[in-house]
Design a protein with these regions (language model features):
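Hydrophobic beta-strand anchors of alpha/beta hydrolase catalytic cores
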Residues: 45-46, 75
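Nucleotide-sugar donor-binding/catalytic module of glycosyltransferases
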Residues: 79-82, 101, 123
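N-terminal targeting signals for export/organelle localization
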Residues: 1-21
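A short beta-strand-turn-helix
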Residues: 22-44, 61
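Conserved redox-active cysteine motifs that mediate thiol-disulfide chemistry
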Residues: 40, 48-65
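Thiol/disulfide oxidoreductase modules built on the thioredoxin-like
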Residues: 58, 96, 103-150
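A generic structural signal for alpha->beta connector loops
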Residues: 42, 72, 97-98
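Structural microenvironment flanking redox-active thiols in thiol-disulfide oxidoreductases
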Residues: 58-94, 107-112
Length: 153
């Protein structure tokens, strides 16, 4: 993907991103803003992934290691899967522990665009006050993600 230098470090999500509706595991449509509000008070690691994405699946063991090292962090998984069935099957199959949401549409749709999504897996780290501290990390950046989390304590 293209690397957009202007977007390498945003400290907050755009209005557009926050207004976007995503689907919760119990099939409710909820705005991204409401999702983030639910988890305020703790740092968040958010991963955009999909069950069809080979790199996402390959990175899952690293994600699990990150979770083991940082148990006090909230983990949000936003999937780009095409159907609810494929999404839920993927969560089961790869035993992904965390809070799960389904994005309506793909990488180039409005939510993907609002997050400057050019690659998945994509990781975003948010501090306990809701400020973005790492806007664009990918599967080769786990060390950076871990260091960022450690610096938040």
């Amino acid at each position: 993907g293209t690397f957009l230098c202007s977007n390498t470090q945003k400290t907050e999500f755009s209005e557009k991103a926050l207004k976007e509706k995503i689907t919760s595991i119990d099939a409710n449509q909820i705005s991204f803003q409401e999702v983030l509000n639910q988890y305020k008070g703790k740092p968040i690691v958010m991963e955009v992934w999909a069950s069809w994405c080979g790199d996402c699946v390959k990175a899952m063991p690293q994600m699990k290691e990150l979770q083991a090292k940082n148990p006090d962090v909230t983990y949000l998984f936003l999937s780009l899967d095409k159907t609810v069935d494929k999404w839920k099957t993927g969560i089961e199959k790869y035993q992904i522990k965390g809070n799960h949401y389904l994005v309506n549409g793909g990488m180039r749709d409005s939510f993907g665009k609002a997050l400057d999504l050019d690659w998945i897996p994509r990781y975003i780290v948010i501090d306990k006050n809701g400020k973005i501290v790492l806007y664009r990390a990918i599967e080769t950046d786990f060390e950076k993600i871990n260091t960022t989390l450690k610096s938040l304590n």
